[in-house]
Amino acid sequence: MANQLILLKKDFFTDEQQAVTVADRYPQDVFAEHTHEFCELVMVWRGNGLHVLNERPYRITRGDLFYIRAEDKHSYTSVNDLVLQNIIYCPERLKLNINWQAMIPGFQGAQWHPHWRLGSMGMNQARQVINQLEHESNGRDPLANEMAELLFGQLVMTLKRHRYATDDLPATSRETLLDKLITALANSLECPFALDAFCQQEQCSERVLRQQFRAQTGMTINQYLRQVRICHAQYLLQHSPLMISEISMQCGFEDSNYFSVVFTRETGMTPSQWRHLSNQSD
C-alpha cells in the first residue's frame, strides 16, 4: 500500500546497538493502521478498545497479549481508557544465546499465534520485569543494553509460562474470578452465557463481580460479550462463505434480524454491507 504508515527504528531506539525498549501507552489513543521496522509485544493492562490485526478485529481488555511481527498491519479504534505497553525489539540485534523461536510465536519464521491471555498472576510478574526493562532501556551506562536484553529474555519466558489460549484457562489455574469469567465469556460465542450459574459455581457475589469487571475493563459484562461476538461475526463475514443467518447462529444470536440490528448499531453498517466492503478491499 503506497500510503502505509511505517513506524521506524530511529524514532524508538536510541542507537543501532539497542535491541529492546518499552513504549508506554497511558492511555492508548486511536492509532491508524501501520506496520513497523521492528517487532513488538503488546500487553493490555486496563480499559478496552478495538484492535484490528491483519484485518481481523479483536475486542481487547486487561490481560490480552499480542505478539506482533514487523510486517503485521494493525490499528486501534473505539478506545476507552485503554492502557497498554509495547515492548519493542529488533530480532537481528538480539545477542543472547536463547532459543527465541521457542519463546516468541512468529519469531523469524516460527509458528505464529498472535493472541493470548495472561491471568492476574502472570500480569503481576510480567509487570515487574517490564518496569525493570524500561528502567534499563532508558539507562546510559555501558551495560544498559545487555541488562535490557537479559530482562527481555526473562520477560518472554515469563509470558510463555503464564500465557494461555483465550478460551482455555488451565483447569489447575489459581487465577482470579475475573480471569475465569473472561475465559468463560470467550467460550460463549455460540451459546447463551448465564452469569448467575457462573457465580453459583464459583461461589461469588454477582453484584461484586459485575463491579470488578466494569472497573477493570470499562465495560459491562453484556457489552463485552456482545462486542466479542460482533468481532467474531466481522471475521466470519470476511473470511467464510457462511450465510448471514448461519453466522448469526455461530455468534450467539438465534434471531438473524436481531443480529443485523446489533451488528449495524456496533459497526455502522449492515452485515451485508460489511461483507461487500471487505470483499472489495481484498
Swiss-Prot record:
One of its GO terms (molecular function) is DNA-binding transcription factor activity. Residues 196-217, 244-267 bind DNA. Pfam families: AraC_binding, HTH_18. Residues 179-277 form the HTH araC/xylS-type domain. It is found in: Cytoplasm. One of its GO terms (cellular component) is cytoplasm. The record marks 246 as: Interaction with sigma-70. Coiled coil: none annotated. InterPro entries: AraC-bd, Homeodomain-like_sf, HTH_AraC, HTH_AraC-typ_CS, RhaR_RhaS-like_N, RmlC-like_jellyroll, RmlC_Cupin_sf, Tscrpt_act_RhaR. The keyword Repeat applies. Its main location: cytoplasm. The keyword Transmembrane helix does not apply. Keywords: Activator, Cytoplasm, DNA-binding, Repeat, Rhamnose metabolism, Transcription, Transcription regulation. GO terms for biological process: positive regulation of DNA-templated transcription; rhamnose metabolic process. Binds DNA as a dimer. Activates expression of the rhaSR operon in response to L-rhamnose. This is HTH-type transcriptional activator RhaR. It comes from Salmonella agona (strain SL483).
